[in-house]
């Protein structure tokens, strides 16, 4: 599997020093461990987010879908964002990885045959026999760790 491109080669504190960037390897490892993410795109009504199952394939993110809003919105190679995360509210820890790139429907028969056998299989009902491929332009991530002595709300 080819690695996805990332913004940072190693973890570095950001100016606020409460946030750090995940390394290239950390981002790829976390993406490979999960199978549910959020595809963000723009349709005629504006930005929309879809929870989707996904697989990694040759350095890209692949999402199975049915004809409809996702395919309509990515026609012509739309720019999209794809986010995967994990959060433990009890410990106030977690992480988030964001992939930014171009999305297009997969149409090549050889690619479709290979992708059809990739897990995970969609949780949502429907055939989900169409595929959207996201070719990353950048991948970035950050750990989430909130000090235990801070309140859950930022305004209080």
Q: What are the residue ranges of the model-derived segments?
A:
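Extreme N-terminal tail/first-helix region
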Residues: 1-32, 153
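A short, sequence-level motif marking secondary-structure junctions
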Residues: 53-56, 102, 148
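Short, structured beta-strand-loop surface elements
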Residues: 67-130, 136-138
């Amino acid at each position: 599997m080819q690695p996805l491109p990332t913004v940072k080669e190693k973890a570095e504190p950001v100016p606020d020093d409460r946030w750090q960037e995940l390394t290239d390897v950390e981002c790829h490892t976390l993406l490979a461990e999960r199978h549910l993410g959020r595809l963000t795109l723009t349709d005629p009504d504006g930005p929309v987010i879809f929870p989707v199952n996904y697989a990694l394939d040759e350095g890209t993110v692949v999402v199975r879908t049915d004809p409809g809003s996702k395919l309509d919105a990515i026609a012509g190679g739309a720019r999209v964002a794809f986010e995967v995360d994990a959060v433990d509210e009890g410990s106030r820890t977690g992480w988030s990885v964001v992939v930014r790139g171009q999305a297009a429907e997969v149409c090549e028969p050889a690619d479709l045959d290979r992708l059809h056998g990739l897990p995970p299989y969609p949780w949502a009902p429907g055939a989900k026999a169409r595929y959207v491929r996201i070719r990353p332009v950048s991948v970035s991530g950050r750990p989430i760790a909130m000090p235990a002595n801070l309140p859950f709300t930022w305004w209080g």
